[in-house]
Amino acid sequence: MPLNIQTLSSQWSDYELLDSGDRLKLERFADVVVTRSEPKAWWKPARKNLWRESVARYIDDDKKNARWEFRGKVNAPVLHLGKINFLTKFMDGSKHLGIFPEQKPHWDFITERAGLFAKKLALKSLAPRKPILLNLFGYTGAASIVAAASGY
């Protein structure tokens, strides 16, 4: 039986999981295709031809010398989400680019709730005021930025 892999992420034109397997994942951040380790991707890649498009690869075979390797000059991608521009960075010692795209469904929820809050106040003819948000995932600051841009 073929393996059916689905991502639990909302649509975002600046991020895409292209393929995964052999303990790696192939992703597109804006126009930059990267390869990063993913220990839970134990299956075989499904779209082998796409892997040639990778221009940045995180090498973490030796944890002490974990680093990014590039094919040519590669600029860190800028990701756009509405009015927000997220500046990413390739950092040796970390496979992350400073943002977790899989959090986008949560950012969508934050934005949606801010809009519902404003509509609720308007329906009750109450003076506009800012909703209150407690951000419990503040590691990168992305959720806080989305919240601020949404009116929190």
Where are these regions (language model features)?
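Conserved SAM/SAH cofactor-binding pocket of Class I
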Residues: 112-124, 129-152
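Non-catalytic substrate-recognition/targeting regions of SAM-dependent transferases
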Residues: 11-101, 108
